[in-house]
Amino acid sequence: MFVGVARHSGSQDEVSRGVEPLEAARAQPAKDRRAKGTPKSSKPGKKHRYLRLLPEALIRFGGFRKRKKAKSSVSKKPGEVDDSLEQPCGLGCLVSTCCECCNNIRCFMIFYCILLICQGVVFGLIDVSIGDFQKEYQLKTIEKLALEKSYDISSGLVAIFIAFYGDRKKVIWFVASSFLIGLGSLLCAFPSINEENKQSKVGIEDICEEIKVVSGCQSSGISFQSKYLSFFILGQTVQGIAGMPLYILGITFIDENVATHSAGIYLGIAECTSMIGYALGYVLGAPLVKVPENTTSATNTTVNNGSPEWLWTWWINFLFAAVVAWCTLIPLSCFPNNMPGSTRIKARKRKQLHFFDSRLKDLKLGTNIKDLCAALWILMKNPVLICLALSKATEYLVIIGASEFLPIYLENQFILTPTVATTLAGLVLIPGGALGQLLGGVIVSTLEMSCKALMRFIMVTSVISLILLVFIIFVRCNPVQFAGINEDYDGTGKLGNLTAPCNEKCRCSSSIYSSICGRDDIEYFSPCFAGCTYSKAQNQKKMYYNCSCIKEGLITADAEGDFIDARPGKCDAKCYKLPLFIAFIFSTLIFSGFSGVPIVLAMTRVVPDKLRSLALGVSYVILRIFGTIPGPSIFKMSGETSCILRDVNKCGHTGRCWIYNKTKMAFLLVGICFLCKLCTIIFTTIAFFIYKRRLNENTDFPDVTVKNPKVKKKEETDL
């Protein structure tokens, strides 16, 4: 709730109280004229004593407050706006005229967007690396849930309180967010900087040998795991608290300082920069995705610093995000809670929006828990707000599903390496979503859409993205022949079993997945399962020879005359549908992003202006409960059902899925996203008809007016 401008009723008491100040104001010019005729008593070269004692900034600040006080003492006419609450730009009492040129929403957006990018980078780094961290240290189920859900749970717990109590002092909360984002980044980076633990790793020979020595299960990185996990969860929790002022109070602050139909552009820019930051973190973290490598001998290796090499580069990225976030501390603290012109904008918006009960127009709430509960009860009785919040939650499920499952889908469907698949997913997902958010905000602002038009826009764009989503299911590749999975070792083995008579004496392990492609165009899980007994490097790549399971295919000799049986990597799927898939998924993400800003704008227009921040807080709690908390788990569980072969290492830990059923994976991914988009359309349709019915019942209160004559004519015909 923000402290709005006091409304003047124009009563006789107020007029009588304003007589004396008015008479004094009229008498002032005559007094000034008499003063001009009298000679000055002070010497020409003598300076005022205050100029010698006080800084210039303090005098200007004091004069500013006196002028505002004198101006507010004169009663206003009913049609006039009291702008005495507007404040100058400065750091506390230090006010400078050169700072006033930055006292506008455009300059605020620069530092606000920088802060959004910093938190987006942290999110991207965490999401792209969390899978490798879980695999590296064999986390338990409860540890995985704590690691994945700490951000969502912490943000959901504080969202309503920050929205209610932070609405009066938004700038202070922005500064707190800047500090907490940097602190959370350092908490994620701190353990990997000072870690000195040594962790034993299992070295496994990847070629066929009858005698192998495999050790290392007794030693584990428990010290590093518990220490890093606690700091990582704490960092995620701090990030969750830091994000709520940005995504709740930041939206209302922008909405209060721009015209009604300009808010879409600013919110679109904010959403776009947030996703750009996430993409930046995704791209920075993608090259650090750990890829299993082949070893050439059975050894027990030791890794210093208690962690994989990629963690060292990882903490540098977190440190960079923390430094940039803290650089916005002082600039953000200089902005006032009420910018110049904000009072007139608020007064203009009060005249436009009256969908809600007229008794709530001049709602006044305190700061105790009873007032918070009363405000929450008012919002919970608003079915339009609840439906729009549910629509936002289901819409986010599509983005969550794409970010969680798309890298795995690309890797397995189009035979890509984990690094390439993750990088490509980031380059498709984030620009598509960011462009959709930006274009959605620009379109609704350019067309100056009313609240009803916003809901229609959400429904239309969701239907288009739904149609594009259906086409994705037809863009998939045929599975490659894989020994032991869909090929039975030329009739000597069984489907579903990697071991066959040709490799049963090799003592192969499925804990390390290092696929090779034989000259028979069949893919093998590892050189050991192909029965290869010899390997040597050719052009910085390892080639394999004397493979007992590979009996057919074109024979190729190397420079030394030895016949090559297999080469590292996956076999060519002879599938060239990747560009078509990228085009469809990119278009789907753009049209899905179109609805992001309109949903937020619609929610702010169906509640009283003093409850806008709290309404966004309620929507974020609903988003967490029905969207971001269960969403990743739903997609992961669906992906697990399409798993064919899973990693179970010698130490008994169950790891990632190595091989998926491509057809089942495609149907599951598209099916869940289709259901989410359908729910978005249903909830928005319900909100639209409830809004339309309420609007027809309250004919005294028109919808948001528009300036464009064409749009105005169209809205009148719709009513």
Curated annotation (Swiss-Prot):
Residues 1-106, 167-171, 255-274, 337-378, 445-448, 605-613, 692-719 are cytoplasmic. Pfam families: Kazal_2, OATP. It is a multi-pass membrane protein. The chain crosses the membrane at residues 107-126, 146-166, 172-196, 224-254, 275-295, 312-336, 379-400, 421-444, 449-472, 582-604, 614-639, 674-691. Residues 496-551 form the Kazal-like domain. InterPro entries: Kazal_dom, Kazal_dom_sf, MFS_trans_sf, OATP. Keywords: Cell membrane, Disulfide bond, Glycoprotein, Membrane, Transmembrane, Transmembrane helix, Transport. It comes from the Eukaryota. GO terms for biological process: sodium-independent organic anion transport. The keyword Transport applies. The keyword Ribonucleoprotein does not apply. Disulfide bonds join C502-C532, C508-C528, C517-C549. Residues 1-46 are annotated as: Disordered. One of its GO terms (molecular function) is sodium-independent organic anion transmembrane transporter activity. Glycans are attached at N300, N497, N546, N661. Strongly expressed in testis. Weakly expressed in spleen, brain, fetal brain and placenta. Detected in lung tumors. Residues 127-145, 197-223, 296-311, 401-420, 473-581, 640-673 are extracellular. GO terms for cellular component: basolateral plasma membrane. It is found in: Cell membrane. Residues 33-46 have a biased composition (Basic residues). Belongs to the organo anion transporter (TC 2.A.60) family. This is Solute carrier organic anion transporter family member 6A1. The gene is SLCO6A1.
